[in-house]
Amino acid sequence: VGSRKPVVAYGDTLEGDLTRRDFTINAMALRLPDLELVDPCGGLDDLRAGVLRTPVSAVQSFDDDPLRMMRAARFSAQLGFDVEMDVMNAMTRMALRPEIVSVERVRAELERLLVSPWPRRGLELLVHTGLADVVLPELAALRETVDEHHRHKDVYEHTLTVLDQAMGLETGADGPVPAPDLVLRLAAIMHDIGKPATRRFLPGGTVTFHGHDHVGARMTRKRLRALRFDKQTIKDVSRL
């Protein structure tokens, strides 16, 4: 039976403790007082290579705490690191496991991902592995919807481009839109989620999405409430 707050067991030695960490880049320590680097899993090499790898098998690591899959996407967005293929395969295989994790923990990781320097990387990883089907199913659904008014293969690609453009509007800390702006970035990825539900085909092959903005606003409020965002954030994002 999965716990909503998994308890990770630790080893009897420093090395044993490190092997139970989430990723090798976090599985290093300095032994005092000599400041000797303890790196049983090759974390320093992975740090230099920009690779996210688990100290033990990815399946075992994610079974210990399924939130680590969200953390992989967040670190990819924060650090610009690549995810090792075994890790990505395990994320795909276990994509539904975050359902047993508390909503608050999932939301916290999603927030960290979105305010990272490269949120597009993290979102693409969530969608590619199927994790978005649990966390942001409305985003994943956009892959199946084509909007002929935009120069993208689907609304999903258009949405990620809008996210990039929204980040370009952010300013320094003393400007009108201090970066990173969580509300702006959430609004960017949610702005077209009403299109799949409102898509209609007209004679001649024309596609319309009449009322998608109003439908999308309702869907946004529902999703953000489910993720337990605060009321002000929900209000601001759905208004945008």
Identify the residue ranges that each predicted region occupies.
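Catalytic cores of the polymerase beta-like nucleotidyltransferase superfamily
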Residues: 1-240
